[in-house]
Each structure stands twice: as structure tokens, then as C-alpha cells.
């Protein structure tokens, strides 16, 4: 496994990370097996913004005795207390969800605490007004959150938060479709997106890449707008070649 160093820290992050959206639909035993296999293969970076609450107790069991081997990307605004994914900027919801996530992950710290999925100015305004931003900053000051991050699909919001000088990592969608104007989250021109990647690199903000295969669409010639299937390796390398990228988060279904 290859590793890249976090610019604002000394963590060595595996260039291949693991997303949790797909694996979260599996049985608990299969989730545990997949996470442990990923660790054995040298994967050490895991995103926790999946679609199902089941990933949290499963990860908690998978990481027993191995918590130091994993870095978790936990989202302040992703709510799982109802059993499935929900999104909120309300402080009480975020506090309740983070408490629940920590309990089920069986951990007392968060490697990367993310301001979750802010795609519009109104989202950031609500996050600040409701006290959610202060909450995550307070948790960082207390040492519970080690690094701050942001997940977004829009270059505009990414640049807005970069201006605030708060984050060490940004989660952003990078794949050939989005960079060249194809797909739901193809937001911003190719030049705007590349300028963002270069800014992150220049300012020492690492990028963790989501949606590298666009839910498998790029791997299927019949579904791809390019009418040609790419391999998983091609998609991963495409993202890793972009400025600022530390890790690419694929979403395995199971082993």
C-alpha cells in the first residue's frame, strides 16, 4: 500500500481508502470481515457517511483492538439515529448523532470531524447560526476531534470554507464524468475544479475523493456517458493524479 502524508499533520494516509455506503447494506458479519480485510491490506482511512446506521456497531466490533490502525472520517450533520442516513444542520440533531456514533464505534475520539455536505451558502449560514460550527470547533479544542474537514460537491462552497482557514481535509467528488460536465454532481467547469484542487494543494488541505466510480457507472460501457468502460484502477489513478489528493474512497460491497 502507498501512503501520502497529511500536510497539516504527520498522519500517513493510505491512497486507497474505504467508503461505507455500499458495504453498509450487508450483514454485520460481512461488514466486520470486509473492514478487517481492508486493514490487513493496509487500508487505514475509512469514511463513515454511509446510507445505513448498521455500519457503526459493525465498525465498532471490527476495530476492537485495532482502533489505532484506522483513521475515521466522521460527519457532523449526518444523522443515523433513525436507522438510515439523514442530513441536518440542527445542533441538537448533530449532538445526538455524534454521541450515538461515538458510542457505537466504541471510541472516544474522531480522527477527522467533517462539516457535512454543505453545497449552498444557506447550508453554511444555517450551520453557523444553529451553533453546529461552534460545536465541532469546541470538540476540536477539547481534543475529541483531531482534524477538521469539509464534504461538499460544489467548488463555490469549497472555496468559501477554505477562506475560513479551518480545515485540513476536504472530501470532494473527482472522476472523469464530473470533471467534464457529465452527471448530477458535475458542478463547476473543468478549469474551476482544477483550480480548486491546486488551491488545496497550495494551502496544505488534503483531498479525500468520493464517488470515484460514480456508483459504478464509469465501469459499465452501457451506462457511461463515454460509452466505454473504465477499470477501477483507471478511475482510482485518475483521482490520485489530481493535485492535493491524499486518498480515494472506493465503496466495496463485501469481500
Q: What residue spans do the PLM features occupy?
A:
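Short, acidic/polar
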Residues: 25-38, 89-106, 152-160, 230-238
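Active-site mouth loops of central-metabolism enzymes
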Residues: 16-29, 78-95, 121-125, 220-229
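Short, well-ordered coil/turn segments that N-cap beta-strands
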Residues: 11-16, 42-45, 66-71, 107-111, ...
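Conserved, mostly hydrophobic/aromatic
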Residues: 6, 18, 46, 59, ...
Amino acid at each position: 500500500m502507498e501512503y501520502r502524508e497529511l500536510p497539516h499533520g504527520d498522519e500517513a494516509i493510505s491512497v486507497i481508502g474505504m467508503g461505507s455506503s455500499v458495504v453498509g447494506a450487508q450483514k454485520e458479519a460481512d461488514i466486520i470481515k470486509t473492514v478487517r480485510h481492508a486493514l490487513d491490506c493496509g487500508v487505514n482511512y475509512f469514511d463513515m457517511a454511509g446510507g445505513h446506521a448498521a455500519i457503526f456497531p459493525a465498525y465498532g466490533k471490527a476495530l476492537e483492538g485495532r482502533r489505532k490502525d484506522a483513521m475515521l472520517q466522521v460527519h457532523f450533520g449526518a444523522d443515523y439515529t433513525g436507522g438510515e442516513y439523514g442530513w441536518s444542520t440542527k445542533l441538537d440533531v448533530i449532538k445526538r448523532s455524534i454521541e450515538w456514533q461515538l458510542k457505537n464505534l466504541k471510541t472516544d475520539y474522531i480522527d477527522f470531524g467533517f462539516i457535512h455536505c454543505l453545497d449552498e451558502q444557506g447550508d453554511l449560514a444555517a450551520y453557523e447560526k444553529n451553533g453546529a460550527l461552534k460545536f465541532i470547533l469546541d470538540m476540536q479544542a477539547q481534543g475529541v476531534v483531531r482534524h477538521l474537514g469539509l464534504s461538499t460537491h460544489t467548488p463555490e462552497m469549497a472555496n468559501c470554507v477554505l477562506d475560513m482557514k479551518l480545515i485540513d481535509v476536504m472530501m470532494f467528488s473527482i472522476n472523469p464524468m464530473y470533471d467534464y460536465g457529465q452527471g448530477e454532481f458535475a458542478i463547476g467547469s473543468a478549469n474551476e475544479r482544477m483550480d480548486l484542487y491546486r488551491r488545496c494543494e497550495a494551502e496544505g488541505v488534503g483531498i479525500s475523493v468520493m464517488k470515484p466510480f460514480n456508483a459504478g457507472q464509469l465501469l459499465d460501457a452501457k451506462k457511461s456517458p463515454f460509452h466505454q468502460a473504465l477499470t477501477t484502477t483507471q478511475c482510482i489513478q485518475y483521482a490520485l493524479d489530481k493535485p492535493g489528493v491524499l486518498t480515494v474512497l472506493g465503496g466495496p460491497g463485501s469481500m
